Regions:
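Small-residue-enriched hydrophobic alpha-helices in membranes
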Residues: 1-40, 50-151
Length: 151
């Protein structure tokens, strides 16, 4: 099986798992951590071009699990995290990873945040090494073993 086929299959499986837990994923910590994860993936290579930012924002709005939250609230949180990362990537990354870590107390939410990162990262057909690296860092911030997600 080609790498892209495995990524698509994995993302599809993860989306199904997220949908099964949709009603459990309504906390503010999950919301904040998810938007931080989306920003990290968007900025994985150290910058975010406007088209990439728009594409990730569109994916956020279309994700059924994230529809538990007001779209404007998600957009604002995503933009705030993106702005931190574009102002100073290294310093911003520390702050954004702290947002991700908010989901650490609830393992199901922590896993869901990682799954969202993988889904967003693989949505363009290429879950590249930079995206994998930031999702792996998020695993450490959430006290989850990266190998659980094939990272």
């Amino acid at each position: 099986m080609a790498l892209w086929d495995r990524i698509k299959e994995s993302a599809s499986t993860m989306q199904t798992q997220l949908m099964a837990r949709k009603n459990d994923l309504k906390s503010g910590a999950f919301r904040d951590a998810s938007m931080a994860m989306c920003a990290l993936v968007a900025a994985a290579d150290g910058n975010i071009d406007p088209s990439e930012r728009q594409k990730v924002a569109q994916l956020i709005m279309n994700n059924e699990v994230l529809q538990n939250f007001p779209a404007q609230d998600l957009q604002r949180r995503f933009d705030d995290n993106c702005n931190k990362l574009t102002a100073d990537f290294d310093f911003g990354k520390v702050s954004v990873l702290q947002e991700v870590a908010k989901a650490k107390k609830k393992p199901a939410e922590a896993r869901a945040v990682i799954q969202i990162g993988i889904i967003i990262g693989g949505a363009d057909g290429d879950f590249d090494k930079d995206e994998q690296a930031v999702v792996r860092e998020a695993c450490f911030a959430l006290d989850l073993p990266p190998h659980e997600f094939d990272l």
